[in-house]
């Protein structure tokens, strides 16, 4: 089955072709980072308009790269949520229109299920069951995964997601959007031990997260540096290091608890923050101590992309799932509500 996947949940327009027998044939991505940077974050209306502008050229590009025609497409998959409603509607409308025109089925894909399954695109994919850490700008969740659609939520952020905390901390120090890569870059030049940030909710049982207090701690530290006349460039580096260490160690502690609680020794990390080098190193070290293994997608498939949507959609289409000819999206959508395959 040849599936055309479309991703438009936020500020990246992603398109990919996935073949159930040959794997990923082609993928293309347009990022709107430059469009939103001057505003310090994503502007939903601008995101939607840009998806409209980019979608069809990217579809043509992917078909050309794969040497395929529209008549070769067996089905379409599109992100149906969660995400920005306007942005989601662009992808859903395009997918349903093409499915109707080409006479093929279409299936709506859960954005976070796409992230969770992205490591399946690698040469050595994880085997079920495993624990997944979904960590992005909008989500921070620990999930037990026994199969596609077989998800048990173990813990989640009670306020800011980890990626959101990265972005907000970067913004308060005057750094560019998106903040995650900026923080990671500065952290490499930070002075170890100058600042020590708390590890939120690690001193109590449970697998939930909270990052809003960490963001406030960073703000107070930054204001103290400004008031005392510190070298602000170095202060940014040192705060970035302390903040990143706190987030990474908090995530690592919770992942270790989740593995022990479930009795599993395989961990998948997915979502934009999973590309963070320090996080990968900490989790690999922790899994090594537990005689387990950590899995993640290549960096370009950690952030939003069409390949993960095409793959996830293909699995559900092969199981006989598809949507009626209607345009339906969900800004909020619990992943545990998905049907099991």
Swiss-Prot record:
Family classification: Belongs to the KAE1 / TsaD family.
UniProt xrefs under PANTHER family: TRNA N6-ADENOSINE THREONYLCARBAMOYLTRANSFERASE, TRNA N6-ADENOSINE THREONYLCARBAMOYLTRANSFERASE, MITOCHONDRIAL
Entry binding sites for substrate: 134-138, 167, 180, 276
Gene Ontology cellular component annotations, sorted alphabetically: cytoplasm
Keyword DNA repair among UniProt keywords: no
This protein's encoding gene: tsaD
Full protein name: tRNA N6-adenosine threonylcarbamoyltransferase
Lineage, top ranks: Bacteria, Pseudomonadati, Pseudomonadota, Gammaproteobacteria, Pseudomonadales
EC number: 2.3.1.234
Gene Ontology biological-process annotations: tRNA threonylcarbamoyladenosine modification
Species in which this protein is naturally found: Ectopseudomonas mendocina (strain ymp) (Pseudomonas mendocina)
Pfam (any one): TsaD
Molecular-function GO term, any one: N(6)-L-threonylcarbamoyladenine synthase activity
